[in-house]
Amino acid sequence: INYSIASKYLFTGSVRYDGSSRFSKKNRWGFFPSGAFAWNVKQEDWLKDTKVVSQLKLRLSAGQTGQQDGIANYSYMPIYYLSTNSYDRYNMGSAGLQYYYTPGSYDPDITWETTTTYNVGVDFGFCDDRITGNVDAYVRNTSDLLNEVITPMGANFGNKILTNIGSMQNKGVEFSLNVVPVQTKDWHLSIGFNGTFQDTKITKLNTSDDPRYKEMVVDISKGTGSKFSFHKVGYAPYTYYPYQQ
């Protein structure tokens, strides 16, 4: 939905209602709203006739999104596995009987990861747009982050369970600046600059502050051993443990 008042005050709103069969019926649907407001300052009477400022707009926005990446199908259901090799069979004489064994780890309440983003920005232009640019600052908080936690021994054949237990924060500033120093009938020279400053850190990985839980180790496909990076509170995701040269 878009609504404008005198081309000065601009309102935008949207709603997503997403569903996924990867979740149980009670968590299958996610409601994700978003809204934005922009003030076209250039259209105000006290700035409209100013030639130095060719455009000036202030922006505010907030919204939520949901994602299901990293979740396998039927993760919320108990799945029984059929034994396949000689080590997973009952020996009855010369025959080995197959059997179904305890379901793997599962969480019936697994749900959407939800990311809430807040943004404030400004668009500007000077000297008939010979100088233009924008600056944006944002904070992005992700809750119900998926993480594998240790399960009690003997609960099943797996020692970890995937569940919504973490949170992460991402914040930063982005800017761009474009300058047109030469603009004639035959020549046009434009120079652009842009940059980003970003800080990302994990803020939670467990239900409690357990000093025994140091970090979540991440598997890799190759390398010495199979562990090289980890997720840890206070650090960016996929922080690495390389050897110092």
Feature roles, as predicted:
Residues I1-K232:
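Extracellular/periplasmic, surface-exposed regions of secreted and cell-surface proteins
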Residues A236:
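Glycine-rich, Lys/Arg-enriched anion-binding loops that position phosphate/diphosphate groups
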Residues T239-Q245:
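Short, intrinsically disordered, charge-balanced linker/junction segments flanking boundaries
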